[in-house]
């Protein structure tokens, strides 16, 4: 038995969640091999081979792998899967696009979004928007598993020296054509990996009022999140959405402002280490998961909070 981990990268460096996926993979079996598919990805390959938990790295290089299209990735991974019992990736956009194709080609059932490894064939995954957890056992000979990155600690990133094997790629899948990629560039921390997240909900009342969230986030060095209601209302773009249909976050500090706390939103943030809720409705569900709750008008509370943060900054200077 051995595990093949699909490494996520940008051809220059590993994506942070790859380290979390390695931890999950090593809980399935200590013999973890990783495959890195790309073009001119030598730096990412070097970083991957330095992970102590990875015993072997398979490198597949070709120009048509540069843009990470799942139609090109799936066939080569299926070919490599002949020697493995488990294929593992993160349950993010990358993994959700790729792993179902791999599972279909292997004619196996996918086990999705696991939060815990019980044994090499039994896993725990959330259901009902995170309000319950199911224990799932897979009897398939080959198991395709996606892991919720925030449920596993990142592995050590240095000190390893994995064996590197270079493998030729397959022919390009010509029915799909890559057009372009648009990436949001920001000086802020990435929402999925930020230590502090400040989120606003429908209670912000308008997009212009979200500048209050922005100011608080600037002072705290935080990422900006939002509820689906705020996104649907057009207050902020959907790449900030936290929840069942958005990003799942587990920061050290999550500040929810004007968010009532629908179960879909709670599913994306209730595992945060410390949760602070500000809402004028004392019966709002968000208070049921909050470590600290402030029943107040956010348009009065946030300016006062900013004033105190400014005082702290002045003292520190």
Map each language-model feature to its residues.
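N-terminal glycine-rich FAD/FM-binding segment characteristic of electron-transfer flavoproteins
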Residues: 1-317
